[in-house]
């Protein structure tokens, strides 16, 4: 029922597939409300339940993840992202699933490199060393991807997809990337940092999962991004300004200043328990441009390339329609 998962369910249903969804006890229907699907209540720590409920399923999509840039205790995040991944994949293998698509992140792929002063986006051939990972979310996903790779080497039919920065509708939580859009719409972004992301429509990411199940090579990983989606944050905010009819921030904050604000913000969070306005993990991520080359997924899978501008327009429309934006 998360951002990518709920969009994936919609795309599967639109193609005539029968869908079974695992939801935690007490989890609201949220973006899946009203959809014709089979809902199973349980937890990814319950291996017997996973194997039983996946029996008879042709495909398994493991898109669930704990995605936070700040927590008092990161132990549950590692349990969900690493051991949860192992449980789901092994259960899917025992249940006889023909294809297992694991949702990783571009955070497990190398960073943009400067070659003779030009930025060269990273691709699937590059792997970031664990020592260079800037936060616990990335570390947990890095270890989870290692689990998926090792299980694929043992013969399980696993395809790994690495979404970049998805944007679009049904971002209920919202995700940290969706929060950028929401902060802009709610006038909470007076300045920006010099960073960059690869933006992609969440619908294309969802379709990319299905294409991976249909066409992906077992043991391979595919960046689900947009070939023309490598934008600086300044460019991103300029596009948002045009779409939303709001002024874009003009003040650029140097990296060191963002880092200081993050340390102060986290200090307050530790004392109060309130999520920091500027997480240290987010500030550290802003140090590098996170640009990627999705050419492999475009060539091998036929990954759709909806213009990123449309992704932002759809996100703005959804946030406004669902009352996330203060009047």
Predicted region positions:
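Conserved Rossmann-fold NAD(P)-dependent oxidoreductase catalytic core, especially the SDR/UDP-sugar
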Residues: 80-137
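NAD(P)-dependent short-chain dehydrogenase/reductase
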Residues: 154-160, 164-198
């Amino acid at each position: 029922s998360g951002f990518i998962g709920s969009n994936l369910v919609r795309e599967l249903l639109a193609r005539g597939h029968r869908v079974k969804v695992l939801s935690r006890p007490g989890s609201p229907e949220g973006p899946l409300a009203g959809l014709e699907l089979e809902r199973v209540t349980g937890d990814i720590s319950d291996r017997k339940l996973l194997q039983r409920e996946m029996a008879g399923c042709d495909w398994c999509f493991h898109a669930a993840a704990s995605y936070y840039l700040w927590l008092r205790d990161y132990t549950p995040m590692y349990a969900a992202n690493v051991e949860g991944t192992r449980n789901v994949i092994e259960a899917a293998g025992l249940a006889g699933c023909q294809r297992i698509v694991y949702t990783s992140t571009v955070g497990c792929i190398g960073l943009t490199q400067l070659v003779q002063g030009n930025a060269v986006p990273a691709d699937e051939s590059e792997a970031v060393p664990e020592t260079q990972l800037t936060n616990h979310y990335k570390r947990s996903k890095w270890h989870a991807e290692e689990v998926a790779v090792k299980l694929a080497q043992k013969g399980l039919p696993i395809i790994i997809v690495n979404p970049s920065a998805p944007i679009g509708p049904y971002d209920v939580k919202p995700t940290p990337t969706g929060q950028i859009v929401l902060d802009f719409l709610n006038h909470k972004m007076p300045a920006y940092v010099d960073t960059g992301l690869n933006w992609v429509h969440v619908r294309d990411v969802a379709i990319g999962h299905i294409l991976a199940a249909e066409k992906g090579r077992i043991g391979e990983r595919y960046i689900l991004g947009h070939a023309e989606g490598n934008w600086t944050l300044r460019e991103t905010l300029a596009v948002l300004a045009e779409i939303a009819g709001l002024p874009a921030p003009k003040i650029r904050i140097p990296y060191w200043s963002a880092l200081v604000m993050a340390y102060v913000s986290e200090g307050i969070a530790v004392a109060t328990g309130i999520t920091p306005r500027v997480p240290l993990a987010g500030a550290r991520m802003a140090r590098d441009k996170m640009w990627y080359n999705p050419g492999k997924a475009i060539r091998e899978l036929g990954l759709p390339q909806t213009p990123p501008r449309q992704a932002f327009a759809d996100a703005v429309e959804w946030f406004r329609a669902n009352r996330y934006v203060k009047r």
